[in-house]
């Protein structure tokens, strides 16, 4: 069985329509943050009822968020997806990212001066204890999705806040509006960048697997030429990809691991910290 994350927006509604005849269950999260939230939920409910599709809904109300709302919302969303995934014994979760998302994510990474192992978003990966599949990531641009929905007369909701430049992704997205040729050039550039990283990625994965087999011991880590990459993968795996590491932070972590001083822990964020326990590197929850 496949789990499909459906917000009620155009991308996920097309994804749902494409897979409606498969063995699926739908998960919808309503944050009740926008006036149109109930409308989006009803769109998903109506479609699933009409097509006899299993639907699980998480309704979040009366909450206070300290810090970044998007980080908080992402954690709530994926915690819920994991529960549904396990309840129905799913083999993968489908997400509706498309080519525009691929380009936007790359530009966000560049803006934040990040140097990831893989630029932008992978079509398939394993995270949060789930097999994640993004069928549209190299298939459709946003304008193509909208045309298909129009032709098939599929209802969807538009998030009115997407037009507001209150978040970095919104600013990048709105700046790329009607710049189709530029988007295509950037898309091709990302594919080339990732292609030339493949050999290095394979070697890094070998080093990481070897380090993992040794229970993440300090000595094996220090032998690797790819310490920055190993730290990125290690932290991502241990925190369910909930921490965005800057290069400066990665260097601080490496310095902490290398240090012979009696430093007990390295704070990663409000939820996680790193420790050196008997020459073994561990990530623990507070």
UniProtKB/Swiss-Prot annotation:
It is found in: Cytoplasm. GO terms for biological process: tRNA modification. It catalyses: cytidine(34) in tRNA(Ile2) + L-lysine + ATP = lysidine(34) in tRNA(Ile2) + AMP + diphosphate + H(+). Its EC number is 6.3.4.19. ATP binds at residues 7-12. It holds the Pfam family ATP_bind_3. GO terms for cellular component: cytoplasm. InterPro entries: Rossmann-like_a/b/a_fold (IPR014729), TilS/TtcA_N (IPR011063), tRNA_Ile_lys_synt (IPR012094), tRNA_Ile_lys_synt_N (IPR012795). GO terms for molecular function: ATP binding; tRNA(Ile)-lysidine synthase activity. SUPFAM superfamilies: Adenine nucleotide alpha hydrolases-like. It comes from the Bacteria. Keywords: ATP-binding, Cytoplasm, Ligase, Nucleotide-binding, tRNA processing. The keyword Manganese does not apply. Belongs to the tRNA(Ile)-lysidine synthase family. PANTHER family: TRNA(ILE)-LYSIDINE SYNTHASE-RELATED (PTHR43033:SF1). Ligates lysine onto the cytidine present at position 34 of the AUA codon-specific tRNA(Ile) that contains the anticodon CAU, in an ATP-dependent manner. Cytidine is converted to lysidine, thus changing the amino acid specificity of the tRNA from methionine to isoleucine. HAMAP family: tRNA_Ile_lys_synt (MF_01161). NCBIfam families: lysidine_TilS_N. The N-terminal region contains the highly conserved SGGXDS motif, predicted to be a P-loop motif involved in ATP binding. This is tRNA(Ile)-lysidine synthase.
